[in-house]
Regions:
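Short, solvent-exposed loop/turn segments at secondary-structure junctions
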Residues: 11-13, 18-19, 87-92, 127-129, ...
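Acidic, Mg2+-coordinating phosphoryl-transfer loop and its flanking beta/alpha structural elements
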Residues: 136-174
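Structural recognition of alpha->loop->beta junctions
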Residues: 104-121, 166-184
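A structural signal for isolated positions on well-ordered beta-strands in alpha/beta enzyme cores
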Residues: 81-83, 134, 151
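Short, basic/glycine-rich phosphate-binding loops at helix/coil junctions
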Residues: 41-56, 82-83, 89
């Protein structure tokens, strides 16, 4: 059976990162207006205050699954050796934030995707340490160690040119229906 690695944030769920930044700053930034992958950079020189603000908060409390993800994951889980792979350590945050984030991600996955066993979760900072037959991610640098590379469009990768993706052997998709079609469903 082929291995399929699927990123959690921005592929399975719309984490509430922007919502938490807006709560902290008292702003109304929109995710679709952003191009930077590391949204926490918006906080500027208040980054340490932001991480303290986030110490006991989750990015996942009411975070929705991305449209079509539940159905697609149910189908793909029967056909592939499927794993959800996700980072839980945020750059420039203290260790308490990362350990809480690990707990919040674990709880979210168990609640929202009960048909996927916790044995199928991989929590890791460097995703390129893991090889898979197929990978689905929103960041091209996380697709290096897979045979079939699928980039799910997100705010921070929408400006990557098709030529660059083609050179790297990456196929762009916009929806979970397109992923199922690409994987012959």
């Amino acid at each position: 059976m082929k291995t399929l690695m699927i990123d959690m944030d921005n592929c399975i769920t719309d984490a509430l990162f922007m919502k938490r930044i807006n709560e902290f700053l008292g702003t109304d930034y929109k995710l679709e207006d952003q191009t930077e992958f590391r949204l926490q950079k918006i906080t500027g020189d208040r980054i340490n205050e932001f991480w303290q603000f986030m110490k006991d908060k989750s990015f996942y409390d009411d975070a929705p699954l991305i449209k079509g993800a539940y159905k697609a994951l149910e189908i793909l889980n029967k056909k592939y050796d499927l794993y959800i792979i996700t980072a839980f350590i945020y750059p420039n945050s203290n260790p308490d934030i990362s350990s809480n984030n690990l707990k919040f991600k674990y709880e979210y996955l168990k609640k929202k995707l009960p048909f996927i066993s916790p044995k199928q979760y991989i929590f890791i900072e460097n995703k390129n340490l893991i090889h898979s037959d197929i990978a689905i991610d929103d960041k091209i640098t996380h697709l290096n160690n897979s045979e079939k590379k699928i980039l799910l469009t997100a705010w921070h990768n929408k400006n990557i040119r098709d030529e660059e993706l083609n050179e790297k052997g990456i196929v762009r998709v916009n929806t979970w229906d397109e992923i199922l079609e690409l994987l012959d469903y």
